[in-house]
Amino acid sequence: MYTADAHCDALLKIAQSDSPLVNIDTLKKGGVGLQNFALFAPVESSIYEQQEMIKKEITLFHMCVKQSDNLHSNPFTFIKNDNTYTDAILSLEGAGMLGDNLDMWNDLKNKGVEMASLTWNERNNLAAGSSQPNRYGLTRAGKKVIQWQNNNNIVTDTAHLNEQSFWQVIELADTVVVSHTNTRALLDHPRNITDKQVAALVNKNGFIGLTFYPLFINGTNRADFSDFGRQVEHLCSIGASDIIGLGSDFDGISSTINGLSNPSDYPALINWLLARFDENIVEGLVGENFRKFWNRRRIKR
């Protein structure tokens, strides 16, 4: 079954000379036809160090694509329902190192970035992250960047934003996703989203990627397929079945769902889901919803 993942941190792992869970071999074994690779630089680093890390990860991304026949990247083509290879998307997770420098934003776009979030968990010069009080939201610079994203058909990722920033993005941005999150109805965690936020994303024709991080799923260090299934069941019950998908956060989380250690384990998850949900729901969840969302975005070019 065609599989797509809206978020992983493999590029940071490679940049730090570590072996990523998301790699050519595991993507192929898992039948992954579409993978978003996030550019991320630790926010405790200096602005210069963050900028250099992002440059390094961009170079590594294009090197990986060039060296592998199984990894394709072309922001100007439609994504086919074909998992004999993996279409690779490039995104930016946290943009404090760019601020509202539009020359730098244009440079990232020219290097293939198609989606970006304004901040990580912290408050920066653009927005407030999920660890911040809701009295903080988008800054004037952040609103300027949202307008630039609209003008350049860049998807705005609201993962890691606090609620105040989220609602401002919903009001201002044309194309919105939450690339990796879970539902707050089942676990009240600031990185999870409320049913009201889910409804806003449905109305916006957005996308929600579900993580495999137990701490966001059930608040512990251990979760299994049934815990993940409850996330899916709840979101389907409130009308979100057409906009939910996978947002694994592989290579960015310290633990994952039991039996789902890397992308090669996706067939086991799919088989478990097929035994409990309608096939069309499972097809949408594991890949088709994200693929269709991305093609709707690319048709605007």
Language-model regions: role of each:
Residues 7, 27, 112, 156, ...:
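Conserved, mostly hydrophobic/aromatic
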Residues 1-36:
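An N-terminally biased module of ancient metal coordination in phosphate/nucleic-acid-related enzymes
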Residues 261-301:
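Mid-to-C-terminal alpha-helical segments outside catalytic/metal-binding sites
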Residues 239-260:
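Short acidic/histidine-rich active-site segments
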Residues 100-110, 132-177, 190-204, 226-242:
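Histidine/acidic residue-rich metal-binding segments in metalloenzymes
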Residues 7-11, 40-42, 91-95, 121-123, ...:
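Active-site beta-loop-alpha junctions enriched in small/polar residues
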Residues 2-5, 34, 87-91, 114-115, ...:
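Structural preference for beta-strand elements that scaffold enzyme active sites
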Residues 26-103, 130-136, 140-143, 147, ...:
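A metal-dependent hydrolase metal-coordination microenvironment
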